[in-house]
């Protein structure tokens, strides 16, 4: 539980609230929307930053033990090249966990990007499956958990 976690596309902090429930405390949030960042509970994250995840992330290489990206890979938001940045800022053997709206998985090229990163041994697949994401709206998402290899 003593690991440094980057919450990419943290929104209002829902992932941070869940992490806190499980005893994690060293996590950092980034989102493009200042309006959403303003709704994050005070002192939940060690640091909150307004960040465009479609551009290089202003973080050092190998800075984080894990990275979460939930609800951000969806229509009109963050594109597949962000996975390279996520991998760059995550340590060797660190974990990257994400969801991808099924409607953009192939259309935006996530399928090819994930396959390429796996084939190039840039990461190792631990879990990857489709699940109900917003069941009430019949929205499904792919859930991925990968271990970074460097």
Regions found by a protein language model. Give the residues of each.
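Conserved alpha-helix/loop element of class I SAM-dependent methyltransferases that forms part
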Residues: 1-2
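Class I SAM-dependent methyltransferase SAM/SAH-binding core
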Residues: 6-56
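A short acidic, Gly/Pro-enriched loop at the edge of an enzyme's catalytic core
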Residues: 55-67
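Residues lining the SAM
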Residues: 69-73, 99
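A short glycine-rich, Lys/Arg-flanked "PGG" loop and its adjoining helix->strand segment in the class I
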Residues: 81-92
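Conserved beta-strand signature within the Rossmann-like core of class I S-adenosyl-L-methionine
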Residues: 93-101
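Conserved Class I S-adenosyl-L-methionine
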Residues: 108-129
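Core SAM-dependent methyltransferase catalytic element
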Residues: 133-150
């Amino acid at each position: 539980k003593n690991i440094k976690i980057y919450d990419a596309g943290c929104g209002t902090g829902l992932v941070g609230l869940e992490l806190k429930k499980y005893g994690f405390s060293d996590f950092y949030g980034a989102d493009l929307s200042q309006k959403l960042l303003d709704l994050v509970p005070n002192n939940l994250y060690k640091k909150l930053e307004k960040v465009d995840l479609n551009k290089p992330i202003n973080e050092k290489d190998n800075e984080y033990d894990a990275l979460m990206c939930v609800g951000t890979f969806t229509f009109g938001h963050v594109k597949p090249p962000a996975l390279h940045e996520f991998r760059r800022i995550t340590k060797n053997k660190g974990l990257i966990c994400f969801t991808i709206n099924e409607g953009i998985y192939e259309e935006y090229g996530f399928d090819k990007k994930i396959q390429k990163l796996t084939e190039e041994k840039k990461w190792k697949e631990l879990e990857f499956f489709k699940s109900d994401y917003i069941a009430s709206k019949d929205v499904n998402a792919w859930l991925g958990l990968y271990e970074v290899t460097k």
